[in-house]
Amino acid sequence: MFPIQIAPNDPRLTQICARWDLTPNDNAEFSLLFEEDILTLKKRDEPKLGGIMVDFVSGAVAHRRKFGGGRGQAIAKAVGLKAGATPTVVDGTAGLGRDAFVLASLGCRVLLIERHPVVAALLEDGLRRAYLDGEIGPWMQQRMQLVHGSSLEALDNLEDKPDVVYLDPMYPHREKSALVKKEMRVFQSLVGADTDADGLLAPALRLAQKRVVVKRPDYAEDLDGVRPSTRIETKKNRFDVYVKAAMG
């Protein structure tokens, strides 16, 4: 049961608390509220940080879908997207769903796993609104589905084996940019670092049919100390690729 502050007279929030096993508590560090029909998370003692929400329809995520480089971008190469190969993906650390959305917008079917109940609630709300959108709703319903649960368990319990398992464990950020500061300060105080992240690699390798992709900051060590088959490097991050079979 995770404590959260909510408005007492909003039945939608009461329902969300029941669904995600959240405990309404007026002394909680975080609050959930609806702002213009968008479920929003706020850190109550730092109101200047603003709210965190999931929005696939507008803003930076939508801009990346339209102008982000398509199948030429690093994440697409990392999961093996190419002509004649559109892999199925399990995102074992879904977070706010941005990377999963990029892959879905390029044609992949993505199953999202998120273990933190507040993050899962935000993600489900973002998906709810995206499913209703006239432009992206039809393919979003087909390609992005959410599962709430620990990846450590879910990766061993899924019956349908995906081509790719994608992991982006929470890692302490060193950057000082305003966006990273705002989101990561809220997020890291909410969920903390994924201290058990090393335990994800083995079940991910068991589940994936073709490859496991791990997104890491450029300064981070290899997940579980295991050297990847190859790396794809970007300005601040890298994608460590553990190949099991050709994409073909």
Curated annotation (Swiss-Prot):
Compartment(s) where it occurs, according to its Swiss-Prot or TrEMBL record: Cytoplasm
GO cellular component terms, A-Z: cytoplasm
Keyword Cytoplasm among UniProt keywords: yes
Gene Ontology MF terms: rRNA (guanine-N2-)-methyltransferase activity
Pfam families according to UniProt: SAM_MT
UniProt family annotation: Belongs to the methyltransferase superfamily. RsmJ family.
UniProt name for this protein: Ribosomal RNA small subunit methyltransferase J
Species of provenance: Shewanella amazonensis (strain ATCC BAA-1098 / SB2B)
Gene name tied to this protein: rsmJ
